[in-house]
Amino acid sequence: SPGPGRPEQAGISVPALQRFAGTLPILGVCLGHQALATAFGGRVDRARAPMHGKVSTITHDGRGVFAGLPASIDVGRYHSLVIPPDAVPSGFIVAATVQGGDDEGTVMGIRHQQWPVFGVQFHPESVLTPDGHRLLRTFLETR
């Protein structure tokens, strides 16, 4: 699989997320998003096709890190693993999904229902994510 591997192989990421979720704001990006699912009992599967350097349009619920963003945004994707919609961990909700295309409905964002803990499958820091800086600013202002 292209990319850095599976969440279980990401050093101390999973135990660190389990330890600090609920005490610190957390934003998991790509592998970090997948690690959140793994840390809290969700599942990560291989995507239908690798998405490396691809742009997709997503829709979101306008809450958490998506607050203040247009209802649909373009995002840069660099991954070959995904959290299936039926495998989002307990305590989290799907906050964003792909709109249109062959992988419509693919989970692109999750949010914990009580804690300031967020995951995004895409890369907000990528030039392919024009509104990514706004998402990151919103996260940095999270308390």
Regions found by a protein language model. Name each.
Residues 5-6, 84, 128:
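Glycine-rich nucleotide phosphate-binding loop and flanking beta-alpha elements
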Residues 64-114:
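Catalytic beta-strand/loop cores that center a nucleophilic Ser/Cys/Thr
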Residues 11-15, 87-89, 130-134:
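Generic recognition of short, well-ordered alpha-helical segments
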Residues 127-143:
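Acyltransferase
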Residues 114, 119-130:
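Phosphate-binding/catalytic loops
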Residues 55-57, 107-109, 119:
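Conserved hydrophobic/aromatic beta-strand scaffold that supports enzyme active sites
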Residues 30, 79, 123:
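Histidine-centered divalent metal-coordination motifs
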